[in-house]
Amino acid sequence: MTQAPSFNPSTSILRHLVADGTDPAQYLGHHIALHGGSGIGGALQAANIPQDYRHLTPQDAPPLAAQAEAARAAKRLSERFREHFKDGYRLRSAYLHSTSPGTGKTTLACALLNEFIALNYLAKLKGLSHHRHPAYFLDVNAWQGSYNLAVALGKDSAEMQAFVAELRLAQAAHMVVLDDIGVREATPGFRTHLHTLVNARVAAGKPTIYTSNVELKELPMVFGERRLADRVGEQCVAIAFTGESKRGLR
């Protein structure tokens, strides 16, 4: 007899969404749908969640113990996610910021994205309204580097096609994390693509979770214009992170 594969339930983003005392074997198949059989696949892979963050949830993400404001905001956002799938509540965007890197912004952003993916999956199982493309993670700093390389290689290069493909994925997803926005000055060409993405999402009423090391009010100086910064701040709640770097605590 073939033995069913086992897994560590503490790594599953479903762990806080199933009834207490549920035998993990009962939701192994659902775990695989989200994480993949090897832990590298499933819905989280499709959403481009970095591997180190795929086990996180807003209930126990490491930075929250030291970030009171962020912890309260995470709880509110989790509640709103549930209302979204139950009653169609329209979600707002969130702007997670701190002056110091490594305070847990990306960690919490991914934890929230994981939660949204899990709730979307459960809504689908229950026959409730859900999203075909629920979520996507985009590292804006890396995306800008990809753009610079693509421009150097030409508009018909494979690199430019890959850059545009990420733009399309981030436009299609209902919820997106735009990580490290405003981390460095943007060229006019890249800024145009970033504005296209942000504007399309705002116009479609799709929520975005931004992370940044600059406050919203400082974005015009980083971008060299106010138009894009204003779009980022539209229908968006700012959440401040404090303290020094906590990297290594994931």
Predicted regions and their residues:
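Residue-level preference for the first positions of well-ordered beta-strands
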Residues: L91-Y95, A135, M175, P207-I209
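Conserved catalytic network of the ASCE P-loop NTPase/AAA+ motor domain
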Residues: D87-G88, L128-H130, R168-Q171, N199-G205, ...
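A short, basic N-terminal segment
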Residues: M1-E83, V237-I239, G243, R247-R250
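Walker A/P-loop nucleotide-binding motif
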Residues: D87-C110
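Short glycine-rich substrate-engagement loop in P-loop NTPases that contacts/grips substrate
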Residues: E69-K75, T99, T103, L113-A172
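Short helix/loop segment immediately N-terminal to the Walker
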Residues: R80-R92, A123-S129
